[in-house]
Amino acid sequence: MKKIAFIVICAVLLLNCKKEDTKETSKVVSITDSIKKPAEFADPKYAEIGKKSLVDMEKGDMDSWMDIYADNAVYVWNSGDSLVGKAAIASYWKQRRANVIESISFKNTIWLPILVNQPQSIESKGVWLLSWYKTTAKYRNGNEMTQWIHTDYHFDSIDKVDRVIQYIDKALINKAMSK
């Protein structure tokens, strides 16, 4: 009889402990949900915008490729080079696609649209689209280059890209462009 009473008491204690844990967890969740997160997932439509831009670049449809850019857009490379303004970006990429790059393809693309609510450093608040893709470019001189590229796009309040930061290995491009 003592064994049965002991087992019943242990079971009751265990069940009561479980109920308390559940109550505390739900309190924590409700407090956490009311706090604005520093960053969160953004609308998947931004990934679709990015995917379409790569398709346009592959086709050489640079006018359609430029549709996503704001007039005040800035295009920056990790080397420190940059293009300022939609006109400068269009001029550079149209010339490059028409006269330097014979064909270009993007494979194994990864897209991550995020909404930055509280910047950690110098990045702007708002929607950022982070992307990674394997790029193969064939140049008009017959040489080819393949590398992984990481590109970050920032969208303004009307869903136009106002900042691009692209991380590339220029040494691979320069080598492929040499005769």
PLM regions and their residue ranges:
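C-terminal motif of bacterial Sec signal peptides marking the signal peptidase cleavage site
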Residues: L13-N16
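Low-complexity, intrinsically disordered terminal/linker segments enriched in charged
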Residues: D162-K179
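Short, low-complexity N-terminal intrinsically disordered segments enriched in polar/charged residues
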Residues: K18-D63, D67
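A mature extracytoplasmic/lumenal domain signature
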Residues: Y69, S79, Y133-T135, T151, ...
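A solvent-exposed, acidic/Ser-Thr-rich amphipathic alpha-helical stretch
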Residues: S64-V127
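Sec-dependent signal peptide recognition
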Residues: K2-V8
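Exposed beta-sheet edge and beta->alpha loop/turn motif
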Residues: K125-K160
